[in-house]
Amino acid sequence: MLKLTHRRDLLVEPACHPRGQGHLSAASGLVQVGARCYVVADDEHHIGALDPDGNDPVQLLRVLEGDLPADKKARKAAKADLETLVALRPTRAWPAGALFAIGSGSRPNRRRGVVLPLAGDGGIVVAARRVVDLAPLYALLSSELATLNIEGAVVAGDDFVLLHRGNGVGGVNACIAYDAAQLLAWLAGDGAGRAPEPRSITPHALGAIAGVALAFTDATALPGGGWMFSAVAEASDDTYADGASSGSVIGFVRADGVLGRMHVVADAPKIEGLSATVADGCLCLLAVTDADDPDLPSQLLSAELQFGAELTGFG
């Protein structure tokens, strides 16, 4: 069993929040860029920037126009559902790299992404953000994944992988792999031209906790082309409704796509976002939670683990 340490709550200045809230409550994706962390929340039009080692309030950066309703039910219906945040490699279009916030695709209004170019110091150039219509990309998946629910993404080796979350009884988790160069070129063109087709769609059975099936929630790249993921056992029968969570796991995937070892996370937090760095044989893991309750702040958790076969399951 894997023990994560509480690092901080994701608190914000109420005066800076569009609804006067003192925290982020639905963290859903996490990327670390140097000494900064960026977090996307699925019920906001902002992303948060924070120092993982500090206590200053999370800075909110607007990525989509307009404000969401204060009512929970109305907000859920209207939100863009930005479930995923992934780091993009430098290209001619964004020389210092970029972040890509991705809508889940589970409803027509949830099929947008936002490319956020980075400055040389790791800050986001908000004025240069690009909103991309992902409907053409998602339409190419409908024949195999009728109820799409994208919850994670990772650039690993030559692949850009989207993680589809299989909800409920009979739901199938899937890794949707694209040629990374093709997908980045399409994004650099603001989604113009024909959307790239996936080169593979691979289903994954992740098991269950307390009889509730595990489903992907996020991923982060590892050295050598492999990656690690988080998955949650949530009792939800579809891609829209939330359900009670029975716990989370952290797992590993080899560069060739083979599933490795999975570790149940102690104390059953609902982990929705994941970021990791590896140095000198140590894996430094950061994770964010979502309690599915707007009155509760999301939390930043961490762990330092020995990176090797005992952890990953690979020799």
Q: What is the predicted function of each stretch?
A:
Residues 1-315:
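Sequence/structural signature of beta-propeller domains
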